[in-house]
Amino acid sequence: MSPPTKISYARRPSMVPAYARVLLGRKPYSAPDGTVIEPVELEARKVVLSTSHIQRYREVCAVPASAQGLPPAYLHVLAMPLHMQLFVVKNFPVKVLGLIHLRNTIRVLAPVDERAPLKLRVYFETMRVTDYGQEYDFTTSYEQSGTVVWEEVSTMFARGTSGPKEGSKRPVIERSGHPETGVATDTLEIADNTGWRYARVSGDFNPIHLTARTAQMFGFKQAVAHGMWSMGRCLASAALHIPNMKIQIDTQFKLPVYIPSQALARTWSVAGGADISMCTMKGDRLHLAMQVRTL
């Protein structure tokens, strides 16, 4: 594999030019047979945290006031400008608007000093061909004072391919087998402005999350909640059960969460962390499954 193309910014770039290129670009929805991935690495050398922005995120995801430190999934939204730049570089082979978020792993490695700047790095080098399409991994990391404090791997999916099935089976977080006793439950009210509120905080204005009309253009009957909002909301619901230390959060996204609707967040305290699920109010359909463990 060739060395990565490296692009460096002093600070996080504006997303406006990237959005224009996403909307006007002519990339395919899946990579053609024989596509060779050229790695790319982007960095923002100075990312400054905003107390007001953190508070807005906490409000959108209903993070309780008693939860200490940065919400575990917050730094994902600050990386959105670099994610957008990554999607439009020539090295990335497919159209971002057709991608589906399959899995996410976050590792919270050290407390973040909200008064000190961070260095942000985003990296892409992997495409896997599976039975149903193509999977792409994006690695995001933050350093503070030379120490990696937060890491994330997001796995995205592009439907359809005629190429060889090279992808290995990935570990699956199945529906929880925990008993109904000992479970903490929380009814989540997903209001009709949830998509817009999260978009304004995250900068991710994907049309499928905003209105029923724009979502229908991409095959959805209603707007659907952003997967990272669902994750952040469930982590907020389970905040009292999550250790305030080094943790790893493994999430699998299942069925879409329609806007507006209700959902049920369920949390089981287990040795070294918590198991969390988000499902329909009847409990018969799973929206996401999550495992939080200490490192």
Where are these regions (language model features)?
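Catalytic-pocket segment enriched in acidic/His residues
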Residues: 213-264, 268-270, 278-283, 287-289
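Hot-dog-fold acyl-thioester-processing enzymes
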Residues: 1-103, 163, 167-168, 176-241
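HotDog/MaoC-like acyl-thioester-processing domains
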Residues: 1-26, 33-37, 82-84, 102-187, ...
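Hydrophobic residues on conserved beta-strands that form the core of alpha/beta folds
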Residues: 44, 151, 246-248
